Amino acid sequence: MKLGILGAGGIASTMAKTVAGMKNVEAYAVAARDLERAQVFAQKYEVKKVYGSYEEMLADDEVELVYIATPHSHHYLHAKMCLEAGKHVLCEKAFTVNAEQAQKLFDLAKEKKLLITEAIWTRYMPSRKMINDIIESGVIGEVTAVTANLSYTVSHVERIRKPELAGGALLDVGVYPINFASMVLGDKVKDVKATAIFQNGVDILDSIAMVFEGDRMATLQCGAREISDRMGSIFGTRGYMQVQNINNPEKITVFDTEHKEVASYVVPEQISGYEYEVESCMKAIQEGKLECPEMPHAETIRIMKILDDIRKSWNYEIPWIE
């Protein structure tokens, strides 16, 4: 399968390096608004075709699947362009800036009979099944609570610090702890409360409490100005487990009620972790599906609505959207 990469930044580089180590897919084309930047990218990662505009790449009949690696403020526009050009789409998180945009893209993809999915990579990783298998084994009993945190020192980055780019920690970083909690506790959310510290009009430190059906709770934190331990903890009636790095799980450790380690698991060796979402897209496309089972459209919409509600509770309005 021939992959076109839309954007030539850091995550685009990771995708190009990942695809180079995969079978049955090639990084065939790259497009950037700056042709010279795209040329440097293509030379570095041995990408065959180079384009100085997104429109030119989308006019290339050889491109089958497009990976959107631009800021999330532009995801809706760029994904719409791809679909209208007849391309399948793997779009980075946050999928869009709100649920309304996401639904429009899903409706268009259905009309065009094209696959589109959100590249929230933790949904596709083997660690997800590993965590679920441990829970289902009953070793930690009934799961009643989850905590997770993820923070990076990225408040200086343009896409984070500018309200007009839908900036802030929530859409860029907060999607990971929210998805982590949802993968463990499910989709029956009864209540969400969130507080935030704002700087220059965007949230830079967020605390989120989610109450799920069955009297279960997730307590989450994300930030853009500090470093956190990236830990995810899942608590049960007979023990608990800790997931090292919720953004790219490395190790899962299980403890009993006496806080003694009873098991430890290391995730399988991987290229980068991006390969799983690409493999899922290829399989779905080959099977004629319009979504990936790891991140169905309904789940993207559900998460986007949670993000919308949180932002609304803060009176955080994106200037060009609301």
Locations of the language-model features?
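Beta-loop-alpha module in the N-terminal Rossmann-like domain of NAD(P)-dependent dehydrogenases
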Residues: 15, 48-108
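C-terminal helix-rich "cap/oligomerization" subdomain common to oxidoreductases
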Residues: 65-67, 213, 280-322
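Predominantly a Rossmann-like dinucleotide-binding segment in NAD(P)-dependent oxidoreductases
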Residues: 122-193, 198, 317
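Hydrophobic residues in well-ordered beta-strands that form the structural core
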Residues: 51, 91, 116-118, 147, ...
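Active-site loop of classical SDR/Rossmann-like NAD(P)-dependent oxidoreductases
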Residues: 267-279, 295
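Rossmann-fold dehydrogenase core element
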Residues: 103-121, 142-146
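Contiguous beta-strand/loop segments that form the cofactor/metal-binding neighborhood of enzyme cores
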Residues: 179-251, 268, 279-289, 321
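N-terminal Rossmann-like dinucleotide-binding module
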Residues: 1-45
